[in-house]
Amino acid sequence: MIRALFSLFRSLHANTHPADLAHAAALALALALLPRSSLLWYLLFAVCFFIRLNRGLLLLSLVLFGFVVPSFDPWLDSLGNWALCLPRLQPVYRALIEIPFVGLARFYNTMIAGGLVAGALCYLPCYALARCAVTAYRTYLYPKIHHATIFFLVRNAPLCKR
């Protein structure tokens, strides 16, 4: 975990593409909105390791969003109830439930359906905000703190080096 955090620290200051960091933050929010009791959460988490993104930011954001998201559980439950009760989607749900092993994803649960819908709706705005934040950090804040003593000490700490 510490190595992942230092990887994040290096990525913020390196010449990496801001999209890698933004995708990590947006995917962490989408994962945090899903309950961890579903097979869908574990499948999406496993997919994260095959996508080009910053894993340090993914893990850090997942922990941070994990503290905030439980306060939205009633809203996610009602959103999932709304999504599952749509008459147009009833044939789709019936077809999905008949496919073997799809029932293990428990998409019929209101919390999981609400988290899936909310994660899909929040992905693009979170991506745009994170990308703008990384660009603003690199443009305005990094040149000001680049020569600070604390920045030099953290950058040259033994844990930061490989």
Swiss-Prot record:
GO CC terms, sorted: plasma membrane
Entry keyword annotation includes Transmembrane: yes
Disulfide bonds: none
Highest rank taxon of the organism: Bacteria
Residues annotated as transmembrane: 28-50, 57-76, 108-130
Keywords associated with the record: Cell membrane, Membrane, Transmembrane, Transmembrane helix
NCBIfam families: TIGR03546 family protein
Protein known as: Uncharacterized protein TP_0480
